[in-house]
Amino acid sequence: MPALILPLIEAAGHWPARGSLLGLDLGTKTIGVAVSDPDRRLATGIETVARKAFTADAQRLLALAAGRNACGFVLGLPLNMDGSEGPRVQSTRAFARNFARLTELPIGLWDERLSTAAVERELIANDVSRAKRAKIIDEHAAIYILQGALDRLATLNRAD
């Protein structure tokens, strides 16, 4: 059975109470990957996957998920600034649909507006060279996306 693809809050209802999540930042050339601790408090970068073909990319992501005992994915959804969905969102949703056929782990979609810009500003402020930024930007964007999702889930859990 294919994985569920849901907004983050709905997906959280399908994840167990504990367990790591993998955060994904889809780029055209790379996929940034981050992982949470099992208590879902902290996101850490683990890899930038150079995109090849969908099957190879998906196999690598599934191997990373298995190696970290992940129970789900958080996929950054690149909405336009006005909240509308453009071509990048359509591409991300297509990736999610294809990826969901290969796993049963629920996929939570999380608004990633400005994630790459925020990460780039932070890297520039820390005097990271342009060449180094190009290599690590997607992984750091995945950390930013996943940490934002974890913080939102923690806020909801405290409200319960």
Curated annotation (Swiss-Prot):
Enzyme class: hydrolase
Keywords on record: Cytoplasm, Hydrolase, Nuclease, Ribosome biogenesis
Tree of life domain: Bacteria
Gene Ontology CC annotations of this record: cytosol
Subcellular localization: Cytoplasm
Chief location bin: cytoplasm
Any GO molecular function: nuclease activity
Annotated Gene3D superfamilies: YqgF/RNase H-like domain
Primary role: Could be a nuclease involved in processing of the 5'-end of pre-16S rRNA.
Family the UniProt entry places it in: Belongs to the YqgF nuclease family.
Protein name: Putative pre-16S rRNA nuclease
